[in-house]
């Protein structure tokens, strides 16, 4: 938003420089983007009057004038402007004047005629780009007055960035309020006494869409002269705010917009039929706008209509048919409050962005409409003449926004600001901001002013107090955050340690979204319900993940599509399982997962290209599990999982509790996901592994170890792991190593059976074992296997 510094100082004039004012406005939260002078650097230009104006004898486009500048004689000046005429008050650069660009005025002859100065245009004084003619000053402009003083050109245009929450500052009034508060000054607002109606004409107003338009004011003004000239002072104020003068009616509404921040509109009364109806548009209804374009309206667009047709898009843009033109004599002034939600997004939908929509989208003071109507009426009557009727109002009080009542606690204020501001100062600041303040036992209760709809919660008041008090006035106290060192438990297994191990095994860490495609997730976890997001980023990211596999498999497909065939990825993160017994109905569990695909080794001239298999990933996972020191109670059991190959899947158990799965992706799922080649995955509950068994130091036995090998025949259904576990249990005291080193099926072994070759390593820490003791332990193992598994020694 642009505005004139002098216009602002008409409302509130702190005794500070322009630079200090800009700094103050910025620190108040209205960032100043730029400050520019309203005119170029010049001097020696005064008000003059063209006393005589005659055609130049030697040039068709020049005129010879005699100009009175209040001196003891008339000046002879040659002028080429087409609007130069007798009796016109003009800006005269006298001999010795210096114009922008260091252009010095000297006495000279132009085509044989003497010229003792120059009649100036706006562009020649660096005021605007208008070079169509010389400046036309009001008839009452005093002769000889310095033009800088008369036009108040020692002024600056200040441009600020107004944040969406401070729509009240989209007008001089709002900025002036803030400056007044910061400097503890009173506002000097222009008089807006109610205009007495001199005619009884009323125009009916009916508001059907009361939620979208809780308040609508209309006023008939008849007999205006739309061809009257807009006063120079108003045109200059508009120009300094970046608004071009159009005609007095539009200029008045724009002036009120800039001054008060209240958009207004004027209809040609004689083009309206029946009365004003504020309603929602009919689907497909068309409206020709003021810029000549046609808009096809949607049913959620607010329109101002008469009894026959739509006249304007409410709060956005007027229509061509009912607009004011050069023949207009009677107008209906409109001033309304529109709900921001009824305007937001509508202008962009139609490719529009207007000053009105910019303000209505952010919110306009719902108590401002009467003041704006009276101000606009008075200005219009003063400039264009005419007679005004009474103000007609349609209002729905229940749909107007209520002023927020907010409690501010003393301890909350002190805690958030970090500095104690006296009670009297806080009350004074809130009162100056326009709040109705009541002091309570633990702080204050404030009713926000109607123009501050961004004041809604306690933190808003804290922010306002700090802003007005001045951030620079709050002492700079270094933040203190005492850190209490927690004792490190030796039994804790750090996730970072596991990640390092996996990286050492050739894995790369992946980080995928917690939001996944529900269709893909249902393929991996059929029949399981997931949390569905009410407002997802996209349909493909609308469900919370039930495992890390969805993201990891998606990463595999993504990389395979980019010619990366050999992949080893792992990820740690939360999964989200609906559970009514958990807090907020969702159980969040930290998981560790991995995936491998492609070849077992990087391409090498001496290594065969072998695809990864179940045991490759199982070995990597066992290395991770070994860090827990719980291998003795960890177990892999053949089980099924809907996402995994029925013959190459195992559940992972820790002390009898299932903590995860490992397996090859099911061929059907592999096809549906467009995976290229065998893919092996695992996933375990991290919390079950996060505590390790602390190893205890033990002496290395000084006595020899003895190995004995046995081959036992068991049924095909007997897991080798169970056989090894039974051996460990029987020889617990002296059996220090049990290992399966061969599996045989074939000649000499009956169908449905297998031969397991097992090495038994026996050792004692106190003595050398005798052969009889070794043989007895081996015999106990064989007997135990025979009893539990009906095993027999292979011949």
From Swiss-Prot:
Mg(2+) binds at residues 454, 460, 463-464. It comes from the Bacteria. Residues 701-794 form the FDX-ACB domain. GO terms for molecular function: ATP binding; magnesium ion binding; phenylalanine-tRNA ligase activity; tRNA binding. Binds 2 magnesium ions per tetramer. The lineage of its organism: Bacteria, Pseudomonadati, Pseudomonadota, Gammaproteobacteria, Enterobacterales. It is found in: Cytoplasm. The keyword Metal-binding applies. Its EC number is 6.1.1.20. One of its GO terms (cellular component) is phenylalanine-tRNA ligase complex. Belongs to the phenylalanyl-tRNA synthetase beta subunit family. Type 1 subfamily. GO terms for biological process: phenylalanyl-tRNA aminoacylation. It catalyses: tRNA(Phe) + L-phenylalanine + ATP = L-phenylalanyl-tRNA(Phe) + AMP + diphosphate + H(+). The gene is pheT. This is Phenylalanine--tRNA ligase beta subunit. Residues 39-148 form the tRNA-binding domain. The keyword rRNA-binding does not apply. Pfam families: B3_4 (PF03483), B5 (PF03484), FDX-ACB (PF03147), tRNA_bind (PF01588), tRNA_synthFbeta (PF17759).
